[in-house]
Regions:
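Polytopic transmembrane helical bundles with strong interfacial aromatic enrichment
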Residues: 1-236
Length: 236
């Protein structure tokens, strides 16, 4: 049979039964296509409750914001699990092509949103929406989601270092972009009655925005230097 022939002459490159089962399960559940609308739904609901809470504080709104925050955290855990899953199946870091890079940018955006805005509901809601939008872009039919072999030029430990750092830097930059837009929205919604509370939220978002852009710039700079080292090592 074909399987026996493959095992006889190509056993060194054939995936194990566990990896085959893992890939079948991964393709069957299509986790990233489901994640994008879940991210967006959780973020929109959370954002609505957060905005209402700015104008009217009560226990119900606080509870709902907390529930939405936990939901976003669970979705991020599934996002992380999906990337680890692809890593296990392919045997290499899951940012080796356009599709995987977009998944990784979405993950990095959500990671930095949770890291910098863990006490800011507006930041978490805004970041979750952008992460969902990024995953939606990855689900479009112009990108091939297939798990393929690594291109020879990428078969290097620099894939783990350079690409991981420089692509992850897009995460805090994206976070800064959405926080800037949300800050402008809050400015438009500011009036005499809510000015004090709005100013606090805008100041909070501005501080987080500055931290995100600073981290993004540092990561992008380091990533460029690492890329130069990779090029020197590969081509001289």
């Amino acid at each position: 049979s074909i399987k026996s022939f493959q095992q006889k002459y190509g056993s060194e490159v054939m995936p194990s039964e566990d990896k085959i089962d893992a890939e079948v399960y991964y393709n069957k559940h299509d986790i990233f296509t489901k994640l994008y609308w879940m991210y967006m739904l959780a973020s929109v609901v959370m954002f609505i409750f957060v905005i209402i809470r700015i104008f009217k504080e009560n226990r119900f709104l606080k509870t709902m914001v907390g529930i939405c925050g936990v939901a976003v955290l669970i979705l991020f855990g599934l996002h992380t699990l999906g990337l680890i899953w692809r890593w296990y199946i392919s045997g290499h870091a899951p940012w080796s092509n356009a599709y995987e890079s977009i998944l990784y940018v979405g993950w990095a955006t959500m990671f930095f949103g949770l890291a910098f805005g863990r006490k800011s509901s507006l930041t978490i809601a805004s970041t979750a929406f952008v992460a969902g939008f990024i995953l939606w872009g990855a689900s479009m039919n112009w990108l091939n989601p297939a798990i393929s072999n690594l291109q020879p030029v990428l078969d290097s430990y620099w894939l783990m270092i350079h690409v991981a750092v420089i692509v992850a830097s897009y995460g805090p930059f994206t976070l800064g972009m959405i926080l800037g837009l949300v800050s402008l929205l809050l400015i438009l919604l500011t009036n005499d009655k809510n000015k004090k509370r709005m100013d606090l939220n805008i100041r909070e978002l501005t501080i987080i925005n500055e931290m995100a852009l600073t981290v993004g710039l540092v990561m992008l700079t380091i990533g460029n230097f690492l890329g130069g080292q990779w090029a020197n090592e590969s081509w001289g």
